[in-house]
A protein has these predicted regions:
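A structural alpha-helix within SAM-dependent methyltransferase catalytic domains
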Residues: 21-24, 78, 100-103, 125, ...
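Rossmann-like NAD(P)-binding element
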Residues: 35-38, 42, 53-111, 119
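Rossmann-fold dinucleotide-binding core
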Residues: 114-167
Length: 167
């Protein structure tokens, strides 16, 4: 299995920002998308605030902001992404509709991970194209400091995608 290089993060609340920082610390290229127009400044402020801890924990010299880009549409953020992290509000209607859109615009083999803490993955991915790529990846918080992630498959999630996600 090839390592994942391109990650999309949808939603830039506390969990989404945590995922962005963690992915950047691991050298991933990260695309961010949020409906809120002020998300860019919020993300950059949190990266700056947390950078001293992140650099120590991951033993890196800096968080490379060249690997971070912000996008205005869902279609743009999903283009060429291999791993998609959804961090939308904890609401079935929102997540089901979002997963349907993600399924339309993402690469057919892209893994889709919802950061949901209590919703069922089979229901979240019920309208998603290729539901075998969908799963729950619920992180411990703060995401960029605590390495634990609860990975939960849906009924149709493939074993291959589970293994790749756990890496």
């Amino acid at each position: 299995m090839n390592p994942i290089k391109n990650v999309a993060v949808i939603g830039t609340g506390v969990i989404g920002i945590g995922w962005i920082i963690r992915c950047l610390a691991h050298g991933k290229k990260v695309k961010a998308y949020d409906l809120k127009t002020k998300s860019r400044s919020k993300v950059l402020k949190e990266i700056k605030r947390s950078s001293q801890y992140v650099k120590k924990m991951f033993r890196i010299k800096k968080i490379d902001l060249k690997n971070l880009s912000f996008h205005k549409t869902l279609k743009d953020v999903l283009f060429n992404s291999e791993f998609i992290i959804e961090c939308a509000p904890e609401n079935y209607k929102i997540k089901i509709n979002l997963m349907e859109e993600i399924g339309k615009y993402s690469k057919p083999r892209a893994i889709i991970s919802s950061s949901s803490s209590g919703l069922l993955p089979t229901k979240i991915y019920s309208k998603c194209l290729n539901p075998e790529r969908g799963l729950i990846g619920h992180p411990f918080n703060p995401v960029y400091l605590l390495p634990g992630v609860e990975v939960v498959p849906g009924k149709k999630t493939s074993k291959k995608n589970m293994l790749k996600t756990k890496k």
